[in-house]
Amino acid sequence: MARILIVDDSPSQLLGIQRIVEKLGHEFITAEDGAAGVEVAKRELPDMVLMDVVMPNLNGFQATRTLSRDASTKHIPVILVTTKDQDTDRMWGLRQGAKAYLTKPFSEDELAEVIERIFNTAEAPPPSAA
Protein backbone atom coordinates (compact mmCIF):
# COMPACT_ATOMS: atom_id res chain seq x y z
CA MET A 1 0.00 0.00 0.00
CA ALA A 2 1.34 3.39 -1.00
CA ARG A 3 0.70 6.77 0.56
CA ILE A 4 -0.32 9.35 -2.03
CA LEU A 5 -0.50 13.11 -1.52
CA ILE A 6 -3.43 14.67 -3.40
CA VAL A 7 -3.11 18.43 -3.98
CA ASP A 8 -6.19 20.20 -5.34
CA ASP A 9 -8.07 23.36 -4.35
CA SER A 10 -11.44 21.96 -5.46
CA PRO A 11 -13.16 19.94 -2.70
CA SER A 12 -15.18 17.95 -5.25
CA GLN A 13 -12.09 17.07 -7.30
CA LEU A 14 -10.22 16.12 -4.13
CA LEU A 15 -13.04 13.84 -3.05
CA GLY A 16 -13.26 12.16 -6.45
CA ILE A 17 -9.53 11.46 -6.59
CA GLN A 18 -9.53 10.28 -2.95
CA ARG A 19 -12.19 7.70 -3.78
CA ILE A 20 -10.15 6.34 -6.68
CA VAL A 21 -6.96 6.19 -4.60
CA GLU A 22 -8.78 4.36 -1.80
CA LYS A 23 -10.37 1.93 -4.25
CA LEU A 24 -6.88 1.10 -5.52
CA GLY A 25 -5.91 0.22 -1.95
CA HIS A 26 -3.68 3.19 -1.24
CA GLU A 27 -3.71 5.66 1.63
CA PHE A 28 -3.95 9.38 0.95
CA ILE A 29 -3.12 12.71 2.52
CA THR A 30 -4.31 16.02 1.10
CA ALA A 31 -3.34 19.65 0.65
CA GLU A 32 -5.50 22.49 -0.67
CA ASP A 33 -2.95 24.41 -2.76
CA GLY A 34 0.56 24.18 -4.16
CA ALA A 35 2.29 25.87 -1.22
CA ALA A 36 0.61 23.55 1.28
CA GLY A 37 1.36 20.61 -1.03
CA VAL A 38 5.09 21.36 -0.99
CA GLU A 39 5.02 21.71 2.80
CA VAL A 40 3.13 18.43 3.29
CA ALA A 41 5.37 16.59 0.80
CA LYS A 42 8.52 17.71 2.61
CA ARG A 43 7.09 16.76 6.00
CA GLU A 44 5.34 13.47 5.10
CA LEU A 45 7.47 12.21 2.17
CA PRO A 46 4.62 10.43 0.36
CA ASP A 47 5.22 7.75 -2.26
CA MET A 48 3.57 9.86 -4.97
CA VAL A 49 1.93 13.26 -5.49
CA LEU A 50 -1.19 13.87 -7.59
CA MET A 51 -1.05 17.62 -8.27
CA ASP A 52 -3.61 19.97 -9.79
CA VAL A 53 -2.13 22.84 -11.80
CA VAL A 54 -4.51 25.79 -11.43
CA MET A 55 -4.40 26.63 -7.71
CA PRO A 56 -3.88 29.71 -5.53
CA ASN A 57 -0.66 30.59 -3.67
CA LEU A 58 1.61 28.32 -5.73
CA ASN A 59 0.41 26.67 -8.92
CA GLY A 60 1.04 23.02 -9.70
CA PHE A 61 3.85 23.76 -12.18
CA GLN A 62 5.71 25.81 -9.56
CA ALA A 63 5.09 23.25 -6.82
CA THR A 64 6.29 20.41 -9.07
CA ARG A 65 9.45 22.32 -9.93
CA THR A 66 10.08 22.99 -6.23
CA LEU A 67 9.65 19.32 -5.31
CA SER A 68 11.79 18.08 -8.21
CA ARG A 69 14.67 20.37 -7.23
CA ASP A 70 14.66 19.66 -3.49
CA ALA A 71 17.02 16.90 -2.35
CA SER A 72 14.49 15.54 0.14
CA THR A 73 11.61 15.27 -2.35
CA LYS A 74 13.10 14.90 -5.83
CA HIS A 75 12.62 11.11 -5.71
CA ILE A 76 8.83 11.48 -5.26
CA PRO A 77 7.00 11.05 -8.58
CA VAL A 78 4.51 13.80 -9.38
CA ILE A 79 1.51 13.28 -11.66
CA LEU A 80 -0.08 16.53 -12.79
CA VAL A 81 -3.89 16.25 -13.02
CA THR A 82 -5.46 19.30 -14.63
CA THR A 83 -7.99 20.79 -17.01
CA LYS A 84 -5.13 22.49 -18.90
CA ASP A 85 -5.08 20.37 -22.04
CA GLN A 86 -2.78 22.25 -24.41
CA ASP A 87 0.37 20.49 -25.64
CA THR A 88 2.44 23.44 -24.42
CA ASP A 89 1.03 22.99 -20.90
CA ARG A 90 1.77 19.26 -20.98
CA MET A 91 5.35 19.82 -22.14
CA TRP A 92 5.88 22.58 -19.56
CA GLY A 93 4.62 20.32 -16.78
CA LEU A 94 6.93 17.50 -17.79
CA ARG A 95 9.85 19.94 -17.98
CA GLN A 96 9.11 21.00 -14.39
CA GLY A 97 9.70 17.42 -13.27
CA ALA A 98 6.31 15.71 -13.53
CA LYS A 99 6.44 12.00 -14.40
CA ALA A 100 3.01 12.12 -16.06
CA TYR A 101 0.35 14.61 -17.10
CA LEU A 102 -3.31 13.65 -16.98
CA THR A 103 -6.09 15.94 -18.20
CA LYS A 104 -9.45 16.22 -16.42
CA PRO A 105 -11.88 14.70 -16.81
CA PHE A 106 -10.22 11.29 -16.73
CA SER A 107 -11.57 7.85 -16.03
CA GLU A 108 -10.86 5.83 -12.91
CA ASP A 109 -9.10 3.25 -15.09
CA GLU A 110 -6.90 5.91 -16.69
CA LEU A 111 -5.75 7.27 -13.32
CA ALA A 112 -5.19 3.72 -12.01
CA GLU A 113 -3.07 2.85 -15.06
CA VAL A 114 -0.89 5.94 -14.66
CA ILE A 115 -0.39 5.35 -10.91
CA GLU A 116 0.55 1.69 -11.40
CA ARG A 117 2.84 2.49 -14.34
CA ILE A 118 4.72 5.04 -12.28
CA PHE A 119 5.06 2.67 -9.32
CA ASN A 120 6.35 -0.06 -11.63
CA THR A 121 9.17 2.03 -13.11
CA ALA A 122 12.71 1.65 -11.83
CA GLU A 123 12.89 5.35 -10.92
CA ALA A 124 10.07 5.23 -8.40
CA PRO A 125 10.80 3.87 -4.93
CA PRO A 126 8.62 0.98 -3.82
CA PRO A 127 5.43 2.00 -2.00
CA SER A 128 5.70 2.35 1.76
CA ALA A 129 5.02 -0.71 3.85
CA ALA A 130 1.58 -0.74 5.41
Question: Positions of the model-derived regions?
Answer:
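Short, glycine/charged-rich "phosphate-handling" switch motifs in NTP-dependent
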Residues: 99
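Active-site beta3 strand of CheY-like receiver
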Residues: 44-50
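Short hydrophobic/Thr-rich beta-strand motif most characteristic of the beta2 strand and flanking loop
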Residues: 25-32, 40
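Receiver (REC) domain active-site loop signature in two-component systems and cognate sites
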Residues: 55
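Conserved acidic segment of CheY-like receiver
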Residues: 1-12, 17-21, 49
